[in-house]
Swiss-Prot record:
Signal peptide: none
Reaction catalysed by this enzyme: ent-copalyl diphosphate = ent-sandaracopimara-8(14),15-diene + diphosphate; 9alpha-copalyl diphosphate = (12E)-9alpha-labda-8(17),12,14-triene + diphosphate
Main location: plastid
Family membership: Belongs to the terpene synthase family.
Gene3D superfamilies, alphabetized: 1.50.10.160, Farnesyl Diphosphate Synthase, Terpene synthase, N-terminal domain
Residues annotated for Mg(2+) 2 binding in this entry: 550, 554
Designated gene of the protein: KSL10
Top EC class, one word: lyase
Protein known as: Ent-sandaracopimara-8(14),15-diene synthase, chloroplastic
Function of the molecule: Involved in the biosynthesis of oryzalexin A-F phytoalexins. Catalyzes the conversion of ent-copalyl diphosphate to the phytoalexin precursor ent-sandaracopimaradiene.
Cofactor(s) of this protein: Mg(2+)
């Protein structure tokens, strides 16, 4: 049978008073007192200083800072790009700078050690700082400005020149080309670097190796890369070829440095117009990429969702996605030309209900779209991961665009794993994403994993270093605080839930799987908002009860008389005294179900202004009768003649209606009787039943066949092949898996599409239940792998977070 309970092994000590229903009133309002097992939300000594200090900041202050970043993007200045813009001469005279404000800003922003760039006490000298410093020196020398600054800058480069030759040091994209190009420019201006000629020769040797190396991508990708780092080639570059990459806004790749170099060599009016707009907007400094508002904001939205705090910024997120949607509809280059931006925009827009089709992703349908790009030349793992995740948001099994993207991106990611060239963190991320599809992950587990691996990233690297989202430290601090406060709520709920189990005498049932921690884990992992305590407890209680009476009907030691007695009692409901109990087991199971569902119905009536009791009882009766049919099939060794006969009963015996639907009435939304009878609601429930049954069957068929039970895998093998040979069983399993996946695609379309009478939060509950099924039944029956399941339960409810200290960021530019 389908274990409708999503639970496993192990219990924790029972404490607290006894209650029969849901949460007592005092637990439904606000957060309960802290519980010491997760005090602080993190283990001592695990959090960096900045985040630790932010944790004591009031939640509202953190939210205000994040909200400001969502409303107005702040970009960090790039000294490298600013230096190149500073080198552009006046339109009418090559003897004067076109952008003197950039020169002035460079003069005012040299560090005490003579360097320029993203530099702080927490960062050692790196190639980006070396590159930015030499670029600023060359820019100043070109206009004979700041001789003292130039001297200090040259001394810094000389002292740290070995960094440029260190192949283990993280390098900006194309560093060997751009750095050697600056050395050539400096030499042509009469500047002498205080380094040995052999060291300079080594830099040009590294440049030669980079230009000759067999990198990823194709000839087209190589041309695009060479154009992207065109400033490193100077007059040796074919600038007419480079200008083929000019965008509508006049830039090349939205890169100020590449565009500035093109302006110097071609005097193209559109490049100068782009640089004019850039300097008019930012003044002296310029960012490493512009525009990147949409990408930056989408990254922030994604970070908020991945860490579980997006609901606090619903209005701001909607504004950002509305803007992105308009850009998408107008086919704007900022979104459509950049692979990761386009992929992330599609994923977020689609999951938030915007009406977009995968047709706009068709230009990425073939692997050549990646191979021919700069991302392909660099074999960019992050871009491939974004494409692979996006490919999973299919609304139709016939969507060949997303299917193709998923196929080739997965293939390239697997090749990267085999190459052993990925960093430890990148390898871990790729392995995880490939192993666990989006529909087999649980929200709160994902939040924890993402919080613990969250990279505040003091700087990122393109051709030069720059800071990503400047709200990342606040995001992490708020996420840690929210996760901690949520855990304290879950822990109080668990204490109450354990006392409820004991009060119901469920622990006296020898045949039943009674595991409060695991059951409540599945509830907290999906209905995770602390304020939804009632909905969470209803799910835990109903899930536990359905598990118990699933075991009741599944247990060979329970007689047919007892099973019939239970069904008769449920049918009589309030008049059950007319029937009586034929055993202690029946009495315990019935009263646990009766008392709990009775209270759920009464509380739901207060929230919905209508009675739902008849529906609750009807669902309980239907599932009990369907379980009885399965028990009879097993006892008589009956095999249904068709899959239709099997599924018509199996969909009901899963009893999903009895534990997925009751929590819907406690989400703070009204669900009318008409809503519950609507086609959309019926389809959501039907798909949940089908997915639950098929996914369970595909993973538990071995032991069910041995136990003489009917299973869709067995039935499919008999129907298609007429036998149960290992080959037939494997073929049947593949078909069942495919059917489950197909139903999941249909479910995704229903949940993520706007329209229909069912509110999105209610539709999400069906989606989350299907994810629970895939999570617990992805590799054999989860009830038989207690260690991993218990670890996951502890991670959500009990164990403190473990964080990695972050670096810091420099000042910002408002966009």
């Amino acid at each position: 049978m389908l274990p409708s309970s999503i639970c496993s092994m192990g219990q924790i000590p029972r404490t607290s008073p006894h209650y029969y229903g849901m949460l007592p009133k005092q637990m439904s309002k606000g957060h309960p007192p802290m519980v010491t097992r997760a005090v602080g939300g993190v283990e001592k000594g695990e959090v960096g200083g900045n985040v630790r200090s932010l944790q004591v900041m009031h939640s509202k202050e953190l939210q205000a800072k994040i909200r400001k970043q969502l409303q107005r993007v702040e970009l960090s200045p790039s000294l490298y790009d600013t230096a190149w813009v500073a080198m552009v001469p006046e339109r009418s005279s090559s003897q004067a700078p076109c952008y003197p404000q950039c020169i002035e800003w460079i003069l005012q922003n040299q560090h005490d050690d003579g360097s320029w760039g993203i530099n702080s006490s927490s960062l050692s000298v790196n190639k980006d700082i070396l590159l930015s410093t030499l670029a600023c020196v060359v820019a100043l020398k070109k206009w004979n400005a700041g001789s003292y600054h130039i001297k200090r800058g040259l001394n810094f480069v000389g002292r740290n020149f070995s960094v440029a030759m260190d192949v283990q040091n993280i390098a900006p994209v194309g560093f060997n080309v751009t750095f050697s190009g600056l050395i050539t420019l400096a030499s042509g201006m009469g500047l002498q670097l205080p380094v040995w000629q052999t060291d300079i020769d080594e830099i040009f040797h590294l440049r030669k190796i980079e230009l000759e190396r067999d990198s990823g991508g194709t000839i087209s990708a190589r041309k695009a890369f060479m154009a992207y780092v065109a400033e490193g080639f100077g007059s040796l570059q074919d600038w007419d070829q480079v200008m083929a990459y000019q965008r509508k806004n006049g830039s090349l790749f939205n890169s100020p440095s590449t565009t500035a170099a093109a302006a110097i060599h071609t005097f193209n009016d559109r490049t100068l117009n782009y640089l004019d707009s850039l300097t008019n907007k930012f003044g002296g400094p310029v960012p490493a990429m512009y525009p990147q508002n949409i990408y930056s904001q989408l990254c922030t939205v994604d970070a908020l969702e991945r860490t579980g705090i997006s609901q606090k910024f619903a209005r701001e997120i909607r504004d950002i996605l509305d803007t992105t949607y308009r850009s998408w509809l107008h086919n704007e280059e900022e979104v459509m030309l950049d692979i990761p931006t386009c992929a992330m925009a599609f994923r977020l827009l689609r999951t938030h209900g915007y009406d977009i089709t995968s047709d706009e992703m068709a230009h990425f349908s073939e692997q050549s779209s990646f191979d021919d790009s700069i991302h392909g030349y660099l074999n960019d793992t992050k871009t491939l991961l974004e494409l692979f995740k996006t490919s999973q948001i299919r609304f139709s099994c016939e969507d060949l665009v997303l299917e193709n993207i998923g196929t080739w991106s997965a293939k390239l990611l697997k090749q990267q794993l085999l190459s052993n060239k990925l960093s430890t963190s990148a390898q871990s991320e790729v392995e995880y994403v490939l192993k666990f599809p989006l529909h087999s992950t649980l929200d709160r587990l994902e939040h924890r994993r993402n919080i613990e691996q969250f990279k505040v990233e003091g700087s990122k690297v393109l051709k030069s270093g720059y800071c990503g989202s400047h709200s990342n430290e606040e995001i992490l601090a708020l996420a840690v605080d929210y996760f901690h406060s949520s855990q304290s709520v879950y822990q109080q709920e668990l204490k109450y839930f354990e006392s409820w189990v004991k009060q119901c005498r469920l622990d006296e049932l020898k045949f039943a799987r009674v595991m409060p921690l695991i059951v409540h884990f599945s509830s907290a992992a999906t209905i995770f908002a602390p304020e939804l305590a009632d909905a969470r407890m209803v799910l835990s209680q109903t899930c536990m009860l359905i598990t118990v009476y699933d075991d009741f009907f599944d247990c060979p030691e329970i007689s047919r008389e007892e099973k019939e007695n239970y069904i008769a009692l449920i049918e009589k409901w309030d008049n059950h005294a007319e029937i009586g109990f034929c055993s202690k087991n029946v009495e315990i199971v019935f009263y646990a179900v009766y008392n709990t569902y009775k209270q759920i119905g009464e509380k739901a009536a207060l929230k919905q202004n209508r009675s739902i009791m008849d529906q609750l009882v009807e669902d309980l009766v239907s599932s009990a009768k369907a379980m009885m049919v399965e028990a009879d099939w097993t006892a008589t060794k009956y095999i249904p003649a068709t899959m239709e006969e099997y599924m018509s009963n199996a969909e009901v015996s899963g009893a999903f209606a009895s534990f997925v639907c009751p929590p819907l009435y406690f989400l703070g939304l009204k669900l009318s009787e008409e809503d519950v009878k609507s086609h959309e609601y019926t389809q959501l429930l039907k798909l949940t039943n089908v997915i639950g049954r098929l996914q369970n069957d595909s993973q538990t068929y071995r032991k069910e066949i041995l136990a003489g039970k009917v299973n869709s895998v067995l039935l499919r093998a008999l129907t298609d092949s007429g036998n149960t040979s290992p080959e037939s069983i494997e073929a049947a399993k593949e078909i069942v898996n495919r059917d489950a996946e197909s139903s999941m695609v249909e479910m995704r379309s229903l949940v993520f599409s706007e329209g229909g009478p069912i509110p999105r939060p209610c539709k999400d509950r069906f989606w989350e239940m299907c994810k629970i099924v895939f999570y617990f039944y992805s590799e054999d029956d989860a009830y038989r792998t207690p260690k991993e399941t218990m670890s996951s339960a502890r991670a959500v409810i009990l164990d403190p977070l473990r964080l990695i200290p972050p670096p810091s960021c420099p000042e910002t530019l408002s966009s």
